[in-house]
Amino acid sequence: MMVFSDCLIFSSLIISYALGLPVVPGQTVMEPSAALPDDGDHLYTLPMFDIRPWERVSEVRLAREGYLYGPPLLGNTSFFPTGVLGDAMVARDKAAWFRDVEYVTNNVYPEWDKAAIALAKAGGIQSLSSYAVIYENQWATTLPDGVASGMLTNWTQDLLFSMERLSINPYVVRRLHPRKDRLPFAVDDRVVQHLAAGSTLEALHCDGRLFFANHSYQAPYPKTPGRWTAACTAYFFIHPRSGAFLPLAIKTNMGSDLTYTPMDETNDWLFAKMAFEMNDLFHSQLYHLANTHDVAEPVHQAALRTMSARHPVRGYLDRLMYQAYAVRPIGEEFLFNEGGFYDSSFALPNWAGKKYATDAYWEHAGHFKATNFYQDLFDRGLVDCTYGPPLTSFPFYETVAPMVEAIEEFTRAFVEAYYPDKTLMDVDNELQDWIIEATEAAKVIDFVPAPMREPEQLISVLSHMAFLAGIAHHALNGATVSEASGVLPLHPSSFNRPLPEAKGSIDSLLPWLHNETEALKQASLLVRFNRPLLDEQEGSLPYMFSGSSFLARTGAPIHDAERRFREKMWAISDEIRMRQFDERGLSQGMPFLWRSIDPRKIPYYLCV
């Protein structure tokens, strides 16, 4: 049991955090602003080498009493921490989050007003090109790099639409297996042959050139009154001659359940692409929750309850989970609350988002090993496919693979520094207790089994945690949303009228799309996900392992590994920042410049 003095200390911490009071002044933004009772400045050491082992035993005992598994938030997914220590940790993270977001919050409303004035001076939204006024020379503080180059000029191109599936949201599309997968829907073969150099739909399928994206799960969700959406499924294909990755057909699965192709009238096909993008925007924001926050948190919670803060693995995880426990409660309170930010813009109500997060978590997104960077892409036939030709360009994989490699290299040096002999893993009771706790009590899905005896297993687990926190999260969230995946008019959050009952009936797309007020509302909501001060605050990806509270407790080999990691991330960032369009008007095979994944622009932690 906790003694009275322990409880008094914990209670005072909770009050200070809840009120946002500075408990420890003078901290940088990217370091914890206050210490929890089990924090300290001891060098990291394994339990069998600790010269004060009784302190560790007492610390872990108090942790098991103070960090408890509470009910999930934002859907029925993984546990959310509670208990005396859990509540204090959440309050600390929320206070840090509000400080972190203050800069954007203070600037978003003046910039909203500025964009509104510019739009009014331009005469409002009179055509599809009018939406560009909302972005051009706007949001200079909250989105200093602006919208991705090409997104406002090339948005009608089919290649931009299809290549978004391989860059800004690569988590939906999969290759259809010629023998294991049936064709999900039919398309007129005369149309397919015209688009695919004479190949039929069946031929594309048999050749392993056919890909499928499925958002039909959105069909049963009730819609927000006065707003409409589709629940699209779509085919994409590798062209037999050019090798380009292109769209083939989009089926709405709602209303008259029309199937559109690039052979349809211009407005019909644009409408279909907008409908798909709307579904994709919904997916990206909820999938990222189920795939990153909901997976990383229980792994860390298990460590909090089984490992001393002196354990190097616990230190590694603590560094990644900076501010992590702010997101779900703040999301419940401000974003997915009844009538909150989400409800103000999207076609599906907040509870539909929570329902999808729940379904996605249990079906696949929450599975730890299956969502490994390489494994997930391999399983969907996107890399090293044995039953179809390779993708000519895969921007997500090509850009992120070197980042993952840098993470793995640092993590290998970290693990080998503390486990020079793998037999040490067998006698590390805290390590083994963590693995058991994660699977049995924290109920992490598809986690590594106990006992953990191979260093490569630990390297894989820790590297995947770093990938989830620092890369996977921001591939779908952060700057990506405001720079690309949520940019109007191609990516609306809702339609203003029901889907067309027949093709050939759209004289103008404007009646379906956001008016001036709704367009500004969507833009201002999505820029809030950006964190423009990250790099100068040393909170960006290159600084993932640079925190003084982390490095000071390690030795020279890890300091050297951290320096190499940081330099590699800077080099990757430099390469991304140098990207330009080639003589064909393409970058990485796309008619837009994808820079939102720049390591200098994305946090190393789960910030939104």
From Swiss-Prot:
User: Where is this chain glycosylated?
Assistant: N76, N154, N214, N515
Catalytic activity entry? (9Z,12Z)-octadecadienoate + O2 = 13-hydroperoxy-(9Z,11E)-octadecadienoate
Keyword Oxidoreductase on entry: yes
Q: Which SUPFAM superfamilies match?
A: Lipoxigenase
Query: Signal peptide span per the entry?
Result: 1-20
Q: Name one GO cellular component term.
A: extracellular region
Provide the function of this protein: Lipoxygenase that metabolizes linoleic acid to 9- and 13-hydroperoxy fatty acids. Specific towards 13-HPODE yielding 89% of the total HPODE.
Q: Where in the cell is it found?
A: Secreted
Taking every annotated instance into account, which residue ranges of this chain make up the domain Lipoxygenase? 29-608
A single GO molecular function, which one?
Answer: oxidoreductase activity, acting on single donors with incorporation of molecular oxygen, incorporation of two atoms of oxygen
In this chain, Mn(2+) is annotated as bound at: H288, H293, H473, N477, V608
Q: Which cofactor does it need?
A: Mn(2+)
Keyword annotations of the record: Dioxygenase, Glycoprotein, Manganese, Metal-binding, Oxidoreductase, Secreted, Signal
* Stored PANTHER family: LIPOXYGENASE
Sorted alphabetically, which InterPro entries does this protein's record hold? LipOase, LipOase_C, LipOase_C_sf
Does the keyword field hold Oxidoreductase?
Answer: yes
The biological process GO terms on file are: linoleic acid metabolic process; lipid oxidation
Name it.
Manganese lipoxygenase
Supply the source organism for this entry. Aspergillus fumigatus (strain ATCC MYA-4609 / CBS 101355 / FGSC A1100 / Af293) (Neosartorya fumigata)
